[in-house]
Amino acid sequence: MSTGTVVQVIGAVVDVEFPHDAVPQVYDALEIKSEGLVLEVQQQLGGGVVRTIAMGSSDGLRRGIEVVNTGSPITVPVGSATLGRIMNVLGQPVDEAGPIGEDERYVIHREAPSYEDQSNTTELLETGIKVIDLVCPFAKGGKVGLFGGAGVGKTVNMMELINNIAKAHSGLSVFAGVGERTREGNDFYYEMEESGVLDKVAMVYGQMNEPPGNRLRVALTGLTMAEKFRDEGKDVLLFVDNIYRYTLAGTEVSALLGRMPSAVGYQPTLAEEMGVLQERITSTKTGSITSVQAVYVPADDLTDPSPATTFAHLDATVVLSRNIASLGIYPAVDPLDSTSRQLDPQVVGQEHYDVASGVQNVLQRYKELKDIIAILGMDELSDEDKTTVARARKIEKYLSQPFFVAEVFTGSPGKYVALKDTIRGFKGLLEGEFDHIPEQAFYMAGSIDEVIERANKK
């Protein structure tokens, strides 16, 4: 193990000088024992100097401090010892429950599985959320993105998915909190504890208040733990909240590393950094990783380079809309913008496909008629269009649903709707079976039976 000295500190970026014959490799972990700080090598600048990112606060560092090269990249504990624990980017416990007691450690920088090892699946994963199961169904072993601006419900939707899938699914889950609020991580921990599934979840947090190095690498730490479970032949759920903060952390250190910024100030290596992470989130012939990732959309602009780069890697995209949220319809999923590769008659079946397409057609027609209604009013529409508008408004209302995780805010109990009930309800709406029921009966309802019951009470 060679030793060097700190020669420059610029925020999260630290330059360290080593003897010329013992320069560390890129991604090697260096340790400053006096400060208890780990650095990760990013560049070799020549003359024995390496440029590193600090995996913690660089406050109090000064030139001349001794740095030790560990000789390998950052390693984190993996396996069953991580379940029920909260760890930081280095795999150190932060839940005050004693040491992890790991049997094995993995390096966080690993190759993606080779093509012949990867497997594709068409098995559907039921979520119990009507709008998702209908228009953008998830695949087991697939990658899903929840796209939305600030405050439209990404985290609440993700928590509901965790509630519905992780509890029903007997497998293991890994939750990577990347640059999000500490409060949300705290709530998540207690929620898992209350529901009795804490012993099946490993949690890795690098919150908003942490230096960019932590936020840049914490997603890889969580992914490494998920890969271990997958390689043991298990089916794993990987939740990442929020993938945008991963990009943002890269942007924060990019300029300090001396790279020229690209579009909108993002790092020039944006696509490559996203690819390195996303290509590893995949299912193999031994086990599967099903990932759900929240993606913040800056200024509600889906063409921003960060969300646009993420789109390319996903099997299903759930787009949350501010306009739908402003109507009071939650989950605020846009059924016209959300897509899924699974929405194919050969995968979901002809009936499901026809109902989903029918719902989208009716909503699209309503969208086109809104301008005419705003200018001329409903009376100028043909009878056929009036029927379409009435059904579209009922469909819009019926796409809302009370969530289990929002019970404390809404006061109404959460509802889980099975896929067959979802299809039956929307099929009836399209065929005019429920034209006699007032649209208010459809708002925040579970299955169609509940809607009929409400209408009969009135």
Curated annotation (Swiss-Prot):
Bilayer topology: Peripheral membrane protein
GO cellular component: plasma membrane; proton-transporting ATP synthase complex
UniProt xrefs under Gene3D superfamilies: 2.40.10.170, Bovine Mitochondrial F1-atpase, Atp Synthase Beta Chain, Chain D, domain 3, P-loop containing nucleotide triphosphate hydrolases
Keywords recorded for this protein, A-Z: ATP synthesis, ATP-binding, Cell inner membrane, Cell membrane, CF(1), Hydrogen ion transport, Ion transport, Membrane, Nucleotide-binding, Translocase, Transport
Keyword Calcium set for record: no
Reaction(s) this enzyme catalyzes, per UniProt: ATP + H2O + 4 H(+)(in) = ADP + phosphate + 5 H(+)(out)
Binding, ATP: G148, G149, A150, G151, V152, G153, K154, T155
Pfam family, any one: ATP-synt_VA_C
Record EC number: 7.1.2.2
GO molecular function annotation: ATP binding; ATP hydrolysis activity; proton-transporting ATP synthase activity, rotational mechanism
PROSITE patterns: ATPASE_ALPHA_BETA (PS00152)
Family matches, as CDD domains: ATP-synt_F1_beta_C (cd18110), ATP-synt_F1_beta_N (cd18115), F1-ATPase_beta_CD (cd01133)
Subcellular location per the Swiss-Prot or TrEMBL entry: Cell inner membrane
Subunit-structure text: F-type ATPases have 2 components, CF(1) - the catalytic core - and CF(0) - the membrane proton channel. CF(1) has five subunits: alpha(3), beta(3), gamma(1), delta(1), epsilon(1). CF(0) has three main subunits: a(1), b(2) and c(9-12). The alpha and beta chains form an alternating ring which encloses part of the gamma chain. CF(1) is attached to CF(0) by a central stalk formed by the gamma and epsilon chains, while a peripheral stalk is formed by the delta and b chains.
NCBIfam families: atpD (TIGR01039)
Known role: Produces ATP from ADP in the presence of a proton gradient across the membrane. The catalytic sites are hosted primarily by the beta subunits.
Family (UniProt): Belongs to the ATPase alpha/beta chains family.
Name of this protein: ATP synthase subunit beta
Species per Swiss-Prot/TrEMBL record: Shewanella loihica (strain ATCC BAA-1088 / PV-4)
